[in-house]
Amino acid sequence: MITPNEFPLVEVLPHNGAPALFIDGQPVFPLLLMTGARALEDLKEIAPCAIHLLTDTFPLCWTGIGRYDFNQFDAALENFLKADPQAMIMPRIHLDAPQEWMDAHPDEVVGYADPAAWSGDTSWGGARHPSWASRLWRNAASEALRELVRHVKNSDYASHILGWHLGSGIYGEWHYWNAVYYPDTSPAFVAAYRDWLAQRYPKVMPEPRTPTIEERRAASLGVFRDPANSRWFIDHAEFFHLLGDQALAEYSRVVKQETDGRSLVLAFNGYLPDLDVNREIDHRAFDKTLRNPDVDSFASPHSYTRRAPGDDAPMRGFMGSVRALGKLWFDEADERTSIAHPTQWKHVTTMEESVEVLWRSFAHALTHNCGLWFMDQGGLWFMDRTRGWYQDKAILDAFAAMGRVGAESMQRPRTRVSEVAVVASFKNAFYLADRSSGLDQVTNTLINPQLEQFVKSGAPFDIYLITELFEPTVPPYRVYAFLDTFFLTDDELAKVKALRDAGKTLLFFYAPGFLSENSISLERMRDLLGMDVQMTDSMILPDGKEQRPGFIVPGANGAVAQAGNVFYCPAPPLPAARLRGVLQAGGVHSYLETDDPLMVGGGYIGIHAASDGQKSIHNPVRADWANVRTGETLARHNTKLV
């Protein structure tokens, strides 16, 4: 039992086969609602709201140099508790610096290779913010966060704090500020980079060098940089991406220290790199962030590319990697409903469609043993009381049903049943030309269109970064599909070859293993594939875009070449129909013969129909079938449901 001014104990622990949220020793399905206190009051006028785990953006309360004002934070918390006395709340805190601080420390403010950053464009977070390399900012923001957590710890509402969602960068999502304008050229960055190089190269330190935009767009062979003469660039990219990890590590440590380890820490991080913009926006040190003992959970909005009814709207992270390290993934389900006023990203026109896309988000989280919060941007950002996105009884009834299903799921085995591992690489970006060069047409194809084909393949899959694929907690799979692993360390290459030699079915795309830490090697790629791959000046991808260089396998018939248990698709995407053949060759069970988005895990199967007509689901073992939304029994002791 906690006292009124003591933080509850909120943890992520193993439970029935997967990481789970625990509150004061009890497993809880992590279904949250992100809305404003006033909007929550409005929802209660329609029907009771079954979701009592809440989140919203709260102020850091850092008002000036050495000054803090907690009144706004206190008032916001009290308003939520008036709206829902049972609420447990996770404040989202942006570690922004006040203008006064930046005025006093101009050398600590982000600089940009592209001067257009200062044009007034705020769509990527705006230009004037502290550099993530700034030691002064990290120290001052850490102190501000420490003062805030101490204040909350001594408040009457401490027992209602679920955890702390820590953010910085664009929308608090740990994307570097104004990333499309190529940060960071500030004196703070240059000084920190010099110190880092001195530690890495203690005998002969190279001079710190910041690449120009033209140098970022350059390459040695088509899209590829030759590691032999690009070490300076690779070092810069690696250091740049470490900064967000380092800053988050300091802030998460503050929370754990000041809460005596009782509060959950969550951060946006580890997104699929699916925006097709320059890579400064990505989280390419996620393998290190994932291993931070002070961060319990990670989150992302799900994909914005396929959200219409019938689309898959996939979660936008590497859930396999997160699960392997014992952490918990959250999906930010910011689906626009039919009553939402903004038109951007809005794909539904009726309340029935609205409810179905919300259930689609829930099914993704349920079958992946993840959490989610439904994000009511209308209730957050508009004072007009007619603008809440969830102000309809059908939606509140759906939330209540989801809460019931989620609670029931915590009593069941929470294991994944996937026989396919899909593997990607964050490090390969350091060896590629910037996307704005026009030289890289293939990586976005692999992250967006190719993943869509996997969703349509009739078999569930788990997605990993290669940095976690060989963790001891990762289960064996029948098929391993390597999306963009053009760069492989010698150790990674040896482990992938061991999978091949053990008889696992492997599927590769474009240029697997073509890059090592020291060189470009076609022979290395041939040895991995066991094929006489030939390099050409260029190739045309199925979408009509030209990619340099190209690769072919002489004598191969069609889009995919085969050598025993190894399959190779040089020009992605590989269509779902052909992909099904590869998976079947690897002995993978097919649950669905149609191209509908499929979600399977934890004893649940979800389908979000992409087309009209009859659907047949095939389970590998006999089972009793029920509609969890209605409770209706559909079939007993059967392997098939129509």
Regions found by a protein language model. Name each.
Residues 31-33, 53-56, 89-93, 162-166, ...:
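Hydrophobic faces of well-ordered beta-strands that scaffold small-molecule active sites
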Residues 42-50, 76-85, 156, 287-293, ...:
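Acidic (Asp/Glu)-rich catalytic clusters
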Residues 103-295, 301-304, 312, 318:
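Polysaccharide-binding and catalytic clefts of secreted carbohydrate-active enzymes
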Residues 4, 249, 257, 261-262, ...:
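Carbohydrate-binding surfaces of carbohydrate-active enzymes
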Residues 40-121, 140, 149-153, 248-259, ...:
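Aromatic-lined substrate-binding rim segments of carbohydrate-active enzymes
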Residues 35-47, 277-291, 354-362, 469:
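Short, acidic/polar
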Residues 1-46, 409-411:
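N-terminal carbohydrate-binding accessory modules
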Residues 48-75, 98, 271-286, 293-297, ...:
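Aromatic-lined carbohydrate-binding/catalytic grooves of carbohydrate-active enzymes
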